[in-house]
């Protein structure tokens, strides 16, 4: 199943990434900003005023809504799934100098733990499970690893210029991507190598492990690699701001309210349009 969520509580699903259901809406002002999927469960997370809001569904039709008091500072920034667990990452996006990072965990996407404050100065925004660990990337170049999602070890001596905006795992390696075509690899989330950059201004917004290769999608170019070291770049058309992959299909979202589909992550076609913008897409 493919799904997308966004502004005014908007949620929609698709079996093939091409034909989408009529959106379900929430309250005006609700914004779902991140999404993840596990076996038999899809989850959207966002904010409404001073609240974190969650929406979980097994079929895309019936949703269980929830949330917690963010106190206008403990906002969830990202969510991912791995090892039978949904992991939500957050912190204070308005802080100066320290992000006050935290995590929340759930086995089903519906019932969540209380906020668990974690070490580190800056927020982790994206994470992936692989090799028996979580590896997360976040603000000001932060990169960290955790066995349980609660206790994190940071990579040393990181630089803000090397901020990674997304991360994927495949072929026994973690690969992160970022601004100006930045790509880096790691075996353990602590030691990073093979730093490469691309074209100035061509930011890589998403990286996916798709059909035995890494696929990094940016506005202008799509990069592919089997090992995270040797890459091939092709100019893309109509590329999305965020992307997901499953069963031979790539989906993505772009301003405003556009859902896109592709079979190669290079040629993208608009397949759905809404008056409300989609912030996140995911697939299972």
Where are each of the predicted segments found?
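Residue-level hotspots at or immediately adjacent to binding/recognition sites across diverse folds
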Residues: 1-284
């Amino acid at each position: 199943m493919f799904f997308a969520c966004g502004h005014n509580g908007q949620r929609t699903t698709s079996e093939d990434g091409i034909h989408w259901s009529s959106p379900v809406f929430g309250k005006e002002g609700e914004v779902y900003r991140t999404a993840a999927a596990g076996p038999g469960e899809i989850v959207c997370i966002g904010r409404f005023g001073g609240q974190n809001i969650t929406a979980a569904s097994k079929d895309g039709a019936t949703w269980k809504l929830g949330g917690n008091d963010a106190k206008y500072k403990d906002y969830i920034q990202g969510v991912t799934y791995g090892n039978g667990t949904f992991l939500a990452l957050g912190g204070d996006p308005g802080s100066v100098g320290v992000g006050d990072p935290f995590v929340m965990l759930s086995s089903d996407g519906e019932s969540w733990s209380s906020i668990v404050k974690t070490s580190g100065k800056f927020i982790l925004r994206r994470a992936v499970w692989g090799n028996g660990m979580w590896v997360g990337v976040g603000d000001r170049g932060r990169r960290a690893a955790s066995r349980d999602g609660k206790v994190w070890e940071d990579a040393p001596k990181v630089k803000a210029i090397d901020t990674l905006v997304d991360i994927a795992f495949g072929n026994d390696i973690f690969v992160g991507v970022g601004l100006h075509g930045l790509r880096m690899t790691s075996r353990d989330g602590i030691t990073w190598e093979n730093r490469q950059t691309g074209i100035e201004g061509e930011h890589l917004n998403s990286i996916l492990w798709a059909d035995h290769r890494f696929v990094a999608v940016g506005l202008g170019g799509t990069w592919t690699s089997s090992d995270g070291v040797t890459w091939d770049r092709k100019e893309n058309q109509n590329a999305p701001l965020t992307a997901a992959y499953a069963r031979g299909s790539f989906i993505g979202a772009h301003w405003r309210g556009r859902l896109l589909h592709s079979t190669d992550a290079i040629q993208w076609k608009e397949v759905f349009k809404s008056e409300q913008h989609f912030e996140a897409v995911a697939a299972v």
